[in-house]
Amino acid sequence: MISEPLTLSTSNPVLAAKGLTRRFGGLIAVNDVSFTVQKHEIFGLIGPNGAGKTTLFNVMTGLIPASSGNLIYQNENISKLRPYQIANKGIARTFQNIRLFGELSAVENVAIARHIHSRSGNPVLSLLAGIFGLPASNAMERKTQRKALELLDLVGLGDRAGEQAKNLPYGDQRRLEIARALALEPQILLLDEPAAGMNPNEKHKLSEFIREVRQQFNLTVILIEHHVPLVMGLCDRIAVLHFGQLIALGEPAIVRNDPAVIEAYLGDES
């Protein structure tokens, strides 16, 4: 099993996977995976198709339960929590397959996420306020709309706020998903193949955008991405999965030259 040396930078992580395993019948999709992620880090997760990357994301965000192992977030075991509970703790994600509300406008997509965040404290009172049109509810609606528009401006979609999500170009839909995730005001942002379908220029802009978002929101970012040059140039550290197992972990220069990685993944890149 790949392990990290205990150093000052890894002794108090914001997130720690400890022996995470996920079985589907006789198939082991994620096999005893352990790693730590530090606050404000951009942490990459790479590997061939079928390596278990998205399954690991699904376990980490509560969409599917781990068969064994634990996920520790800010010294709390969140392994048994449901997705909405994990989101309320401060972990948000995007998906490999875009999951927007296509019939709704861009600003409405972001506003929905803001509602989830702002009303998590007392949903019953918030519901009653909305039903009866109380001033507090009206003020919240205005604040939600204003924040949603600010986030769209941040991701470069301010001029398309009123367009239906389904009519946006693919790259803009990706940015809208990120804006929606940011609306939850997360501490950790998980991005599942954010550069999928983008041309080289768009990928370069995405890298710069992720750095800017990390800085502006004081985020920790964990991303899955198939475009190896993007990951190598963007991430502080990288973990490599192969057939569900962690085969390498470290800074980009170390991972790039790891023989196991070259054989399993990087050697297949054109």
Please report, for each region that a protein language model flagged, where it lies by residue.
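Glycine-rich phosphate-binding loops of nucleotide-dependent enzymes
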Residues: 2-270
